[in-house]
Amino acid sequence: MAIVKEGYSLIFVMFATGLLLIFFGFWPIAVICMFLALFFIYFFRDPNITITQGEGLILSPCNGTVLEVKEKSDGQSVIRVFLSVFDVHLQRTPVSGTVKKVEYRPGKFLKAHDPQAHIVNEKNIITIENENGVYVVEQIAGILARRCVSWVKPGDILKAGDKIGVIKFGSQVDLYMPEGYKIDVKKGDTVVSGVTVFASIR
């Protein structure tokens, strides 16, 4: 199983500190450091998956639990997903297409279940376009997740399921999609990045 590169430094520091503390005989603190190193390995895991294939599908951009499925007045739909600290935290593109824009927006760090979190919290906004429309993936920071990392830039050409970024320590991902799709998930569903079908074109 691979590890997301953003976890390397944390894992190394915890292991190195633990070994140093063992050398000097500080076993209780060393055990805590080793436990944290193992937790970071688990948290930043990048498991091998088989990407769901098919025409006209929108895949889940993240692992987690669906918080809300909502149709907006302009015909767009939005699906909001909560990521706990136990979920895989890397994000994948829900569709094939071209990255049109990547925007960082500073903000607050409210907990993901706060109804205002998706509006006021710090976030990265990744806009992807293909022949079926425009799709927006929002990586949203939270009360613990204080850093959202995007791995893509405008002009990048993506295939559905490609990795696009990571959020550190639990938060929320929102996906906005154009009209013309049948939603295949509901509130409370557990979803898997690149595997679960969010919606299919009508």
What label would you give each PLM region?
Residues 1-202:
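Contiguous, well-folded functional domains in the mature portion of proteins
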